Amino acid sequence: MSIENLKNSLPEYAKDLKLNLSSIARSTVLNEQQLWGTLLASAAATRSATTLREIAEEAADVLSAEAYNAALGAASIMGMNNVFYRGKAFLGGRYDDLRAGLRMQIIGNPGVDKADFELWSFAVSSINGCAHCLEAHEHTLREAGVSREVIFESLRVAAIVAGVGQAVQSTEALAAAAV
């Protein structure tokens, strides 16, 4: 199992992450598509090739092809949107009257349940640190009737995967440097 491979690759100092990853992979708060889509989108957002490969391998066995692509699509489109809207927010409203002019059709037609896509976008926005997008996706999820518990669990998944990605990158960098 690839989650097992990922857990086994974590060093002793990341024991909490190993335990959290075990726990979150068995979440009953999220349905299977929500969980594995959030895991996959979050892994893509970490920019850790190993984390993405290991989670993607298992996600491919669980998710439909449409959900797999939509989760990666959420990570990709949020990679653009989070930079744009976070940057725009730093400018203190001086550009709020200008149109974004960015193509974002996947958000309107993700190929899966829109609430699931929003959940994955919410998770990625938390990893990428965009308060504007995080709040917008949370609002859309609440309007769609998604419970606070489901939204919060998605945030937990994102946090754990982000921490795992950081630990994996540190471990790989130190191994490459023979430290």
Curated annotation (Swiss-Prot):
One of the Pfam families matching this protein, by short name: CMD
Keywords linked to the UniProt accession: Antioxidant, Disulfide bond, Oxidoreductase, Peroxidase, Redox-active center
Active site, UniProt feature: 130, 133
Record-annotated disulphide pairs: 130-133
Domain of life assignment: Bacteria
Record EC number: 1.11.1.28
UniProt record, GO biological process: cell redox homeostasis; response to oxidative stress
An annotated Gene Ontology molecular function: alkyl hydroperoxide reductase activity
Reactions it catalyzes: N(6)-[(R)-dihydrolipoyl]-L-lysyl-[lipoyl-carrier protein] + a hydroperoxide = N(6)-[(R)-lipoyl]-L-lysyl-[lipoyl-carrier protein] + an alcohol + H2O
Gene3D superfamilies documented for this protein: AhpD-like
InterPro entries hit by this protein: AhpD, AhpD-like, AhpD_core, CMD-like
The protein's role, per its UniProt record: Antioxidant protein with alkyl hydroperoxidase activity. Required for the reduction of the AhpC active site cysteine residues and for the regeneration of the AhpC enzyme activity.
Subunit structure: Homotrimer.
Family: Belongs to the AhpD family.
Entry protein name: Alkyl hydroperoxide reductase AhpD
Species assigned in the record: Nocardia farcinica (strain IFM 10152)
Lineage of the organism: Bacteria, Bacillati, Actinomycetota, Actinomycetes, Mycobacteriales
